[in-house]
Amino acid sequence: MSFAVARMTKLKADNLVGIGNHDQRKTTNHSNEDIDVSRSHLNYDLVAGRTDNFKTDIEAYINENKASKRAVRKDAVLVNEWIITSDKDFFEQLDEAETRKYFETAKQYFADNYGDENIRYAVVHMDEKTPHMHMGIVPFDDDKKLSAKRIFNREALQHIQEELPQYLKENGFDVQRGNKNKERKNLSVPEYKAMREELKKIETEKQETQAKLADTKKQLDEIKPRDTKKIASKPTLMNKNKVTVDKSDLADLEQRAVTSDAYNFEKIHLEVGNHSLRNDLSEAKGRNYELRKENERLQKLVGTLQGIIRNVDEFLHKKLGINLPEKWLERAGLKEPSKKAPESSQELDRHKSDELGGPHL
């Protein structure tokens, strides 16, 4: 049994121009690759004549019928558009008249519950892969107050999902509602079509895999008789539980056993080796990460120490007119190492004293 599909989107004033161009096929360049323009003449509007220009005519209908004299907010939802359809197999069982009746029946359900005049368009597209209807409803309540949030609240949507399939079924269409799922996400048209293409791809891969499995099974069936060829044997005279075979057959059996054992051993060896390599790689990545973090920590520490040494050097120079030994600055990375001739033993002793005792005051 097929499913009745009903999905709603909210349209504001800024959306109506683009939606109108799409629904009424007013442009020749379509972003939707599923549209077959050679079949666009088969499209029809079940409430033809109510809306020619989506934005202008729908805004005019709202202004003429709303109870309040205040202007409609710019960000208000003006239309709740419902896309009504089912699956392709369902429509393939219907002729054109039955297909039209399916959409008329669905439209009548909404007319009975939300007002026929509030349905400003009900465009059926027959030029795409699966027939479907775009039906725009102005969300007026009984007091002619515009409120999409109140008219199509969560409770109302649940009623529609329950009642519409039953209504269609009572009118002769073999459909059922989809599975209940509170966490189900409503997909946009591009998302839905992308998912549909992904499903087609998966189905193709499934068929290819099944074909490969069938081919592999056929090859195994052909190999099996050859691998299990009958070896001429005869029981020994002294022991019926033992048989004798020709030397050539025995050698063939031994060779097969050796080959099989070697293959299995090599396979296991490679699997163990791969597992070991994966472990080594994982450990190396972990160690590399730890080293990077340690290097970052040390670099920060070096930067801090360099700052302290630089401040001390500047303080001594400013207050006492002296500086830290150049050797200290070189070791701290604050000065390039000097390239001087080898120092005398006295100078070496002096530098050693500097390193141990600090600057001479």
UniProtKB/Swiss-Prot annotation:
Gene Ontology biological process: DNA recombination
Keyword Ligase: no
Binding positions for DNA per the UniProt entry: 44, 114
Region (Disordered) residue spans: 331-361
Cystine residue pairs: none
InterPro entries according to UniProt: Mob_Pre
MF term (GO), any: DNA binding
Keywords attached to this entry: DNA-binding, Plasmid
More about this protein: Contains conserved positively charged amino acids probably involved in the binding of the pre protein to the RSA site.
Family: Belongs to the plasmid mobilization pre family.
Function: The interaction of the RSA site and the pre protein may not only serve a function in plasmid maintenance, but also contribute to the distribution of small antibiotic resistance plasmids among Gram-positive bacteria.
NCBIfam families listed in its UniProt record: MobV
Name assigned to this protein: Plasmid recombination enzyme
